[in-house]
From Swiss-Prot:
Role: This protein is one of the early assembly proteins of the 50S ribosomal subunit, although it is not seen to bind rRNA by itself. It is important during the early stages of 50S assembly.
Family annotation (PANTHER family): LARGE RIBOSOMAL SUBUNIT PROTEIN UL13M, RIBOSOMAL PROTEIN L13
InterPro entries documented for this protein: Ribosomal_uL13, Ribosomal_uL13_bac-type, Ribosomal_uL13_CS, Ribosomal_uL13_sf
Signal peptide region: none
Binding partners and assembly: Part of the 50S ribosomal subunit.
Family listed: Belongs to the universal ribosomal protein uL13 family.
Keyword Ribosomal protein included in the entry's annotation: yes
Name of the protein: Large ribosomal subunit protein uL13
Molecular-function annotations in GO: mRNA binding; structural constituent of ribosome
Length: 143
């Protein structure tokens, strides 16, 4: 009888992938990234282990959304204080902090537990085309 082998933390190989967000649709891009962060593209995928890879996203300010979402999509955050709810539209958040748009989209597609938080730490998002991870030799992710 065959036994399923659970990979140990030492045997998990982590690769670095580079994604250019220029002219990509936000949701389609986020699903690709979340899949790689979880490790679902690997034959050693295990749901309860962090088997995923690192993902570097560049040109975050050039990501696109379809329809009227640029003027209608709202991003909410709360300071934790009474009356501390802040609401911001997609276009103003894209001018101010474009990294947060991709981060929130991907974070919502990861597990909502400690494993998801651990996988989310492997996502690196940058506003422009420059990133400080050249030493890791990232491979372009075909998406």
């Amino acid at each position: 009888m065959n036994k399923t082998i659970t990979p140990s933390i030492e045997t998990i190989e982590r690769n670095w992938f580079l994604v250019d967000a220029k002219d990509k649709t936000l949701g389609r891009l986020a699903t690709e990234i979340a899949s790689v962060l979880r490790g679902k593209n690997k034959p050693t995928f295990t749901p309860h282990l962090d088997t995923g890879d690192f993902v570097i996203v560049v040109n975050a300010e050039k990501v696109e959304v379809t329809g009227k979402k640029t003027s209608q999509k709202l991003y909410r955050r709360h300071s934790g204080r009474p009356g501390g709810m802040k609401v911001e539209k997609f276009e103003s958040l894209q001018e101010r902090i474009p990294e947060r748009i991709i981060e929130q989209a991907v974070k919502g597609m990861l597990p909502h537990n400690s494993l998801g938080r651990q996988q989310f730490k492997k996502l690196k998002v940058y506003k422009g085309s420059e990133h400080p991870h050249a030493a890791q030799n990232p491979v372009s992710l075909n998406s």
